[in-house]
C-alpha cells in the first residue's frame, strides 16, 4: 500500500527499490547509477551487485533494508514462535548475501530466550517466485 509504518512498505522489493532511488538522488557517484543504466532499471539484484562491488551507498541501502526486514521478522518470531521463516521472491534469490546478515540482525531482537534465538530458522525458498502460489495450491491437500 505504501503507507508509512507498514511492513511491506519497508521490507519488500518495492521498499528496497524506493530506498535505492532515494539514495541515488543524494549520491550521483554511486555505482547504483551504472548498474541501473546497464539494464535501464534498478532492482534487488542490481542493488546487491553494487554492494558486492564495494559501493558504500548500495551497502547503506541494503543494511537499512535488512534492518527493517529484521525488525519485522523478529516481531513475528516473538509473537508466533515459528520453526521456520521462509522468504521468497527475487530478493530471497540473493541467498546468503541476504540471509546471513539478516539472521545476525534478527537474533538480538528476539526476546531473551536463547531457545527462541536458535529455534527459528530463516531460509530462502527454493521455489523462487512461485513459492506462494505453490503453497496456496497445496493448502487444500493439507487440510
Q: Positions of the model-derived regions?
A:
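ATP-binding/phosphotransfer module of carbohydrate and carboxylate kinases, centering on a glycine-rich
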Residues: 3-143
